[in-house]
Structure formats: structure tokens, C-alpha cells
């Protein structure tokens, strides 16, 4: 993107790009560590439920007292969004309902939004993106997180004239992880409870990485941004290393494991018996591409590309992602170019709540990474037609029916407040896209 010279010029002229950060957790702290070493960039406001903790975070990532004193800290995110001393908002709370509210307020106030909050994006991103476009502001995925990095690879492949067969990321997966809870998660990671606590690791958040929910959310986000298909019955998580991507993730008709030619999928870094996969992609992202003619296929071989046995399918991948350390790219792309680093375009994929165990009438759902539900990726048209409850709203609401373990929870199975802003917005989005498909 060749941004650095523009940033230097802004630094020289005293005209930095200014940011309001909402949520100073892990992602936010990684961004903050880079913000003070980047010319032409300034954080003017930080909104967090605990402003004093946010100040300590700034100190911990290397900010000086002078730099901390130059920022306005608050626990009132909506009021912060309404101010006029910044160019772009970074929404990094991870709370779906709050994320929707913050994004809508940002759009109302003409601010670009970098949506770190994939939970909110999958819950309501298709409609948020439409509202942002109508208001003339950028609604963007967060560069550094796996969805944006995957979208970049997809865009590269398509812009080069290749067909995208599959795209996604890697993770650590075994089928039994779907039932993991915050009480069992550290055993699966091989980390002691004491070490996790000392490192400040949130058991519910880390459990959402393990139980498949986060993978489902990220693949839904990619599907919605790149018009790729979700599998018909959830992610399959095939064990696969970097060198085998083109072999495993080609269509079933060509000898691979893909249900759909042009879908999202997550590959596991471990075999089903627990053995490690060779050259795993646990922390990375990939795209599998197909040559559209014999000449391009021949070039794959000539230039050392790793292909399947036919020579027509190959893969490009990035074996890492640096989370908030790379977020600046989204900020600069939105403000200097007016272009998102990936953005929702349609409603292809949805993530629905699945019971982890038998649930009784009156039980309160505890959402992503909890003890009651995990999130499963499904085609959005299936989710809407069957009136399934999105995982982003499966928190703090009571069941009015008993649910058997492994079954999806529906809107009719819970007591919800139709006047709740996030629920009302989601319902309006479902109506919009249902009508569009008719």
C-alpha cells in the first residue's frame, strides 16, 4: 500500500491520523504498543469499562507518563464516539451487542469504523456495512486478525485471475473440544490454572478459541466479505499442513475433501488421534487457488509452487498473524485510501448457538466460550429459515424450553426482549436479507 511516506509527511506537518480506541484488552493493548512508535498516528481517546486499568495497560506496553496524560480516558464509549477530535474508531470490545451500538453511533457521527469485534460483525455486519456505505464512511475488518488477512489473500488470488477454491485459517481442533468449558480449557491447552491466571488469560475467551466458536465466527466473516460458501453442516476442520493444502482443500470431485468449490474451511494442527500435523498452519491463514488454463498450471510447476497431483490447484498462505500489532494498516487504509481491509458485502454465513449439554427450562445462556453453548457455522439462509438463535445473542437470556445436547437453539426457545437494540437490529437485518432472497 506504500503508506509510510504519507505518514512521515503527516508527522512532519503536525497532522497525525487520530484514533479513538474502544476496549483496551489484548487486541487493544497490542495496537497501543505500536501506536507510539508509528509516525503520523495519534490516539486521542480510549474508552474502556475500567479507565484506570486502561491507563495501566498503556504503561505496560511502553507509553510514557506524558503520552498517557495526552489521552482522554473514559468509561462512556458512546460519549467518546460523539466527540470530534479523531478520524477513526477502533471497536475492540469483543461484546456483540455493544459493538453493534458503537458502530451505529460511529456511522451516525460520520466516523470510520475498524471492527475488531468479529462477534458484532457476524451478528449484524451485513446491515452495518450498508448503513456505513450510505453514510459515506468506511466499515472495515481489522488487519492483523485472521479474517482480514484471509480476505487479502482472496482478493490477491482473484485479482490475479485465479479461481478461489477455499480460504480460511488454521487452529488446534479435536471434536471433543466443542464441549470444552472455562473449567476444562487449560487442560486442553496444557497450561496450569495458576500460570493462566498469572498471565491474565481469560478462560472464557480462550475457550471460545478452542470450542470452535471463534473459528465459526471468523469463517462467517470471511464468507460474508468474500462471497464464499459455508459448509452445509458446519466446519469440518480437516487435519492439514501447509504443504498439503492444495491436495486436501480441492473439490471432492477432484479428489479432495471440499463439499463446495469455493468455500471457507478451517484446518486442524493436530490429527484426530492427537498427533501433531507436519508443518501445521495453526496461527496462519491460506487461500487455495485453481489455475484457469494449462499454461498457468504449467507456470505453477516452473516456479516451484506446491500443487496437488493434477498441478491445477495450489495454495498461498501466511503462517502467522500479529493481531493488534498489524492494526495500523486498517486505520491508514480507511483514512488515507478510503478503502477497508476486508468488509462485509453479503449475508452468506451465520453462527448459531448449539447446546453443549442438556439444558433445562429457565437456564440462562452464557454465550461464546461458556458452559452452555458453542457456535456452529451454517449458511445464513438455513439459519434464517429455521429461526436459529445467533451465538452473538445467546448470552444473558433464559430458555423457555428444554434443549437436548447437540441441538441448535431457536428464537422460539428463548425469552428475548423485542425492544433490545441489538435484537431489533438483527431482526431487521434478517427481514432485509430474507426479502432479498425471494
Where are these regions (language model features)?
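C-terminal catalytic/substrate-binding lobe primarily of soluble NAD(P)-dependent oxidoreductases
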Residues: 1-10, 188, 192-438
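N-terminal Rossmann-like dinucleotide-binding module
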Residues: 1-61
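Short, ordered loop/turn segments at secondary-structure junctions
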Residues: 49, 94, 118-121, 144-145, ...
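Conserved N-terminal Rossmann-fold NAD(P) cofactor-binding segment
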Residues: 50-83
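Rossmann-like NAD(P)-binding element
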Residues: 72, 79-99, 112-116
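Rossmann-fold NAD(P)-binding glycine/threonine-rich loop
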Residues: 93, 97-105, 109, 117-138, ...
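Rossmann-like NAD(P)H-binding beta-loop-alpha module
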Residues: 140-210
